[in-house]
């Protein structure tokens, strides 16, 4: 869609590194996940284990235990994607109603403070506000996600960090830690 519609959202398909970065238990957990993926029929081209030396070719970490890598991941700049998708669907005649608080919804109908909208398809893209909608509240799982981004980093710094091919990364701990190199050379 982004290619067909010409949406500039900094799309980069560099894969993702799930890193065992701090504890040997992380390595055991990731290797167990890899066995589960193999049991599902996903092969070496889909997910592969990287020993510390191989991981260091992609991301330089202090004393890692290894990583699980999949090429099937891309990063984007989400605000640019949303603006591009909005332009695309509006050009098709779709009307977007922003700042419209949803009071209730059911299949085919959304009721807002300003009125009701009927549609064949309803996408409840409400993120953290799902609890206020009875049909969704019971399915909500609260997740906190924080993001910090550096200023654009010089090439010398990136040579020390890695991530030359646009890979995203994550650490295999209970507290979700993840990041990427942005198109304008920030570490986010």
Annotated model-derived regions:
Residues 3-7, 39-43, 60, 90-95, ...:
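Generic secondary-structure signature for well-ordered alpha-helical cores
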Residues 32-40, 47-55, 76, 85, ...:
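N-terminal FAD-binding dinucleotide-binding subdomain shared by FAD-dependent oxidases/monooxygenases
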Residues 1-52:
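Dinucleotide-binding Rossmann-like beta1-alpha1 core, especially the glycine-rich loop
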Residues 26-30, 48, 74, 78, ...:
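Generic structural signal for well-ordered, non-membrane alpha-helical segments
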Residues 10, 54-62:
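Flexible hinge/switch segments at interdomain interfaces of large molecular machines
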Residues 47-51, 96-98, 111-112, 124, ...:
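General beta-strand structural signal in soluble alpha/beta enzymes
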Residues 3-12, 102-107, 116-156, 160-188:
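Active-site substrate-recognition segment that forms the wall
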Residues 28, 34-40, 62-121:
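Helical element adjacent to the flavin cofactor pocket in flavoenzyme catalytic cores
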